[in-house]
Curated annotation (Swiss-Prot):
Record-level GO cellular component terms: nucleus; ribonuclease H2 complex
Keyword line: Nucleus
Organism: Xenopus tropicalis
InterPro entries linked to this entry: RNase_H2_suB, RNase_H2_suB_wHTH, Rnh202_N
The keyword Nucleus belongs to this UniProt entry's keyword annotation: yes
The protein's assembly and partners: The RNase H2 complex is a heterotrimer composed of the catalytic subunit rnaseh2a and the non-catalytic subunits rnaseh2b and rnaseh2c.
Family statement: Belongs to the RNase H2 subunit B family.
Protein's name in the database: Ribonuclease H2 subunit B
Amino acid sequence: MVSRRQRPGSGQSEQWVLLAPESLSDDAKNLSDKTIFAKLRAPCTDKGSMFLFIDSGQQICEVKAFHEEYRSWFIGQTVQQDGRLLIATPIDPMFLVLHYLIKADKEQGKFQPVEQIVVDEEFPSCSMLLQCTPVSKSLHHVTEEKEIGSKKFYKYSKEKTLVWLKKKVELTVKVLKSSNICVGGGVQSATFIRNTQGSDVKEEDYTRYAHGLISEYLTEDLREDLSKYLGLPDLSSPTPEPPVKKRKVSEAPVEAEEDYTKFNSDSKNKKSNSKMTAAQKSLAKVDKSGMKNISAFFSPKAKATK
């Protein structure tokens, strides 16, 4: 689908090619204030990232851009110079709110209205997260709640958050298995299909893979806490190998059990004992008297005495 945005000060609109959920199709046909692009703080990097609010925040998508040099799009009878492909992936907005809950707990450590917790001067659009229905329904999974009159107050709960994240990991594992996604140490590329998928992949491999996917939306401390909570061993420290068994060394001299010298023989005796060929036998019978060795013809002549 093609997304459009009006350029300020001109009647021309800016376009992108966007892969997005079907729920965005109606808003794409007609310009609507219900669909908004907003820059929010990414929990993993603590930097700004682009998100898409669909239907007034009923669904939130993370927007990633696939970009290659010298790429354009042909749209109708025009050429779209911006050749990027934007991909909008649905995300649970609680991952974005969780960052502010943890921060407020470290700084104040007390119950507060959620409107005072989700505040960011650098990314003021974060207040839009509170309008999302999934956030209001899921706050109790990661916080302790207090209600005074008609007002609710919240405080981050690490224990409840780990339980909630573990369920997320378990659901992700089910999707990985049902989708036949290759996991484990033997996988070098997600595009490779491994025939022995079921034989050498352990449950721990699925859990570790799912933990890695979920961790892309968590702070570093929470990633480590979740890994310990799931019982995943630390791969940075290698598993100690069992000690090598030492062989007993005897002080008694080593003696040969067999006399190997009997196999030794003089090479000359071997030659004499070897059988002679028919040509050699005939040559031996020839009378060699008066014959000279061939080397005698090449030796220097002796000087005659005067």
